[in-house]
């Protein structure tokens, strides 16, 4: 028969911090991380009171896992308390409520100390959304609604904490010394990716630099830490209580950069893990950049795209959109984009996390000029990255609807458009004119001036070469068939 554990606490252990160099982080781009640390435990048989104070301010207490990595010791946490409030002047006034403490005040340039009894600390709120109440202090038998000076607090007892900490009651049947691993999730830390793409004036080869930025607002610093970045849309519930950084905790933001390169990504279920090859030190409220990608000689292509319709026409449920005014309003701007294939043959070939791409052009004088940016989605290996960087200055487009006719008896509708593309540049260009065919599900192009490509169920694309100074006209007619009879014809 298994013997019952002794329930009397035999020892109180204070773990001030984890083992140096044994901390690791798995940071997700959804404002949370898994924090892992190694703590030295010296437990006696029975129930031990243990205090671990090296905890993130926005830790998720219910996520705590304390274990023996070797699997030899079964650590049983019978009870856990988390003290996570940041200590402020109001907090300490509340601790000494009902007691008399000293206050330092200045009168006519001279300092002196006066005693005052804390009747009310001011930490209590009259309602959840209301600001704290004013403190009430008794000085010389008189009550006042403000502090008489700077409070000078007495020495704190051992049960008071100024840093977030876990208090555990850990049961073990026999005495044991071990290096235990603690793991828990914490909010207020995240990472995001940025890409700098450098193009040359006379070449389609580009340089791609990828950076990961860590933003740490957990209330905890990490020294010499192993870091993994997890990319993907992971289902994670938000904190039950909104985690807000207290105003008292705000300090000057520290921004540092590193130059380590890591382009190895490993699969984790349906996500990807990027492991940084070197250890990182990350202070609280620090933002740090580390380089994870550097690719030279990436073959790219500048493209011009004209999506003329200012608003899309879409079917609604089982009903066709036969509104005569739908899809008529058009744009005159031709967008500029860069595209390249994310393949090993093109010096890339790694899963690229979503991030902002900034494009720079190296001019003839070798100086870099900013030419646009784009929020790129996550891109799997071998897929094409297409990033829109702005609008072409010397390319102009017009889009005009030339016909719209509905035949209720035949359940059909026809619609015709003409697109004009003008090139004011000194060199020839090719413009991709994309048109959305969205009034109804069944359609066909009954007439066209140029060949087109059907991109999907509702999109066609014309690749139109335009020489310098030329205006090209592209026209087409779409025939919608099998229109539902219940649609009201305008």
Regions found by a protein language model. Give the residues of each.
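Long, intrinsically disordered, low-complexity accessory segments associated with secretion
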Residues: 2-4, 10-490
């Amino acid at each position: 028969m298994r013997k019952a554990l002794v329930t009397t606490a035999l020892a109180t252990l204070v773990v001030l911090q984890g083992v140096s160099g044994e901390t690791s982080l798995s940071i997700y781009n959804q404002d949370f991380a898994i924090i892992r640390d190694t703590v030295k435990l010296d437990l006696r048989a029975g129930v031990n009171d243990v205090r671990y104070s090296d905890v993130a301010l926005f830790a998720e207490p219910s996520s705590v896992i304390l274990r023996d990595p070797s699997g030899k010791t079964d650590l049983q946490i019978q009870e856990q308390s988390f003290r996570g409030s940041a200590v402020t002047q109001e907090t300490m006034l509340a601790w000494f409520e009902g007691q008399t403490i000293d206050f330092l005040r200045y009168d006519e340039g001279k300092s002196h100390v006066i005693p005052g009894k804390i009747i009310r600390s001011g930490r209590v709120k009259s309602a959840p959304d209301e600001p704290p109440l004013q403190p009430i202090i008794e000085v010389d038998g008189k009550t006042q609604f403000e502090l008489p000076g700077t409070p000078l607090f007495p020495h704190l007892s051992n049960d008071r904490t100024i840093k977030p900490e876990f208090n555990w009651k850990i049961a073990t049947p026999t005495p044991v010394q071990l290096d235990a691993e603690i793991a828990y999730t914490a909010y207020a830390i995240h990472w995001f990716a940025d890409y700098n793409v450098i193009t040359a004036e006379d070449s389609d080869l580009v340089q791609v630099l990828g950076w990961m930025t860590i933003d740490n607002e957990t209330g905890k610093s990490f020294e010499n830490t192993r870091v993994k970045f997890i990319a993907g849309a992971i289902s994670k519930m938000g904190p039950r209580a909104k985690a807000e950084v207290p105003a008292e905790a705000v300090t000057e933001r520290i921004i540092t950069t590193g130059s380590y390169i890591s382009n190895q990504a490993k699969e984790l279920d349906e996500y990807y893990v990027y492991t940084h090859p070197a250890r990182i030190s990350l202070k609280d409220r620090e933002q740090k950049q580390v380089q994870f990608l550097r690719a030279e000689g990436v073959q790219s292509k500048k493209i011009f795209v004209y999506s003329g319709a200012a608003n899309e026409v879409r079917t609604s449920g089982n009903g066709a959109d036969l509104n005569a005014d739908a899809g008529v309003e058009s744009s005159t701007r031709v967008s500029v984009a860069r595209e390249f294939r994310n393949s090993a043959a093109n010096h890339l070939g790694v899963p690229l996390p979503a991030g902002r791409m900034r494009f720079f052009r190296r001019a003839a004088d070798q100086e870099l000029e900013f030419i646009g940016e784009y929020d790129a989605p996550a891109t799997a290996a071998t897929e094409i990255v297409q990033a829109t960087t702005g609008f072409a200055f010397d390319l102009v487009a017009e889009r005009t609807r030339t016909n719209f006719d509905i035949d209720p008896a035949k359940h059909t509708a026809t619609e015709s458009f003409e697109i004009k593309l003008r090139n004011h540049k000194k060199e020839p260009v090719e413009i991709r004119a994309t048109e959305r065919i969205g009034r109804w599900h069944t359609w066909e192009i009954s007439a066209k001036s140029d060949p087109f490509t059907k991109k999907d169920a509702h999109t066609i694309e014309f690749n139109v070469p335009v020489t310098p100074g030329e205006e090209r006209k592209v026209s087409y007619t779409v025939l919608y068939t099998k229109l539902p009879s219940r649609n009201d014809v305008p």
